[in-house]
Amino acid sequence: MSTKRVLAAVSGGVDSSVAVHLLRQQGYEVEGVILEFSPAHRAAVESARVIAEQMKMPLHVIECHREFEENVILPFCREYREGRTPNPCILCNPSTKFALICKAAAELGFDFVATGHYARVEHQSGGTAVLRKSDCLERDQSYMLYRLTQQQLSMLLLPLEGLGKT
């Protein structure tokens, strides 16, 4: 049986690094991916490169300036002008972040995608993937992922699902 491949979203931070470590411990072959949302995001990309090098992990960088502007910035500004305060991450996750990461994973031959979010995906009989709260309720981030599609959820591994953050 071949080793399953995971494309893990990394930020250069602790949570995504721990997620990569846990996936490797579980026997997955892991490569990293980071989205460059704008030129101002280049420092985060460089931070992720340093971490990826330290972890001896290939890193894929997806430049998505246009998608981020169209799917997140412009809708955020429209909502804000209407007196609402939208959460940009909730706008970004299904339309940009996970859409692009899942697309890249499929094109590059990965079996799964992963992030360092604190939430759970439950795979039910019949193939339905259901988003659930993290076992660590004080760190739960399921609300950030509630708009993901079935396709996105079915590909998603969340290795931090049962961990607390100290």
Where in the sequence are the language-model features?
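ATP-dependent adenylation/nucleotidyltransferase module used to activate substrates
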Residues: 1-147, 157, 163-166
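Short, glycine-/aromatic-enriched active-site segment of Class I SAM-dependent methyltransferases
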Residues: 154
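Gly-rich Lys/Arg/Thr-decorated short loops/hinges at beta-loop-alpha junctions or inter-strand turns
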Residues: 150
